[in-house]
Curated annotation (Swiss-Prot):
Name of protein: Large ribosomal subunit protein uL16
GO terms for MF: rRNA binding; structural constituent of ribosome; tRNA binding
PANTHER family named among the record's database cross-references: 50S/60S RIBOSOMAL PROTEIN L16, LARGE RIBOSOMAL SUBUNIT PROTEIN UL16M
Entry's family note: Belongs to the universal ribosomal protein uL16 family.
Keywords: Ribonucleoprotein, Ribosomal protein, RNA-binding, rRNA-binding, tRNA-binding
Function of the protein: Binds 23S rRNA and is also seen to make contacts with the A and possibly P site tRNAs.
Gene3D superfamilies linked to this entry: Ribosomal protein L10e/L16
Length: 141
């Protein structure tokens, strides 16, 4: 599972996920991509589940790039614990996703196969996404 090797601080404040993505919105590696159309939070398990779904569909042809990395710790207190006594332990690692962010890129397969593979990955993610090509990337959301 994806997580940072080490961090400066163990725990982080929740924060708010507002606005649109201003980085990670354009193609870097591949010809086809999965782009977020709404805000959400993705954890390392969801990233891995979607990656497995799309690589199995294309039978490991071509190449896939994961353009997101969960670097934000999410904490949780144990069940049936009274309030207070500090912040809970780190439960999982997440990344805030804003609309317009590219999550996966693919190359080395034809468009129809990439569309089907990325649609399978799309169903594993907790927010709405859409399939984009290098030609159609200028359409915003």
């Amino acid at each position: 599972m994806l997580m940072p090797k080490r961090t400066k601080y163990r725990k982080m404040m929740k924060g708010r996920n507002r606005g649109y993505a201003n980085r990670g919105t354009e193609f870097t590696f591949g010809d086809f991509a999965l782009k977020a159309t709404e805000a959400g939070r993705i954890n390392s398990r969801q990233i891995e589940a979607a990656r497995i779904a799309l690589t199995r569909f294309v039978k490991r042809q071509g190449k896939t790039w994961i353009r997101v990395f969960p670097d934000k710790p999410l904490t949780k207190k144990p069940l049936e614990t009274r309030m207070g006594k500090g912040k809970g332990a780190v439960e999982e690692w997440v990344m805030n996703i804003k609309p317009g962010r590219i999550i996966y890129e693919m190359a080395g397969v034809n468009e129809e196969m990439a569309r089907q593979a990325l649609t399978l990955a799309m169903h594993k993610l907790p927010f709405k996404t859409k399939f984009v090509t290098r030609e159609s990337q200028n359409e915003i959301y």
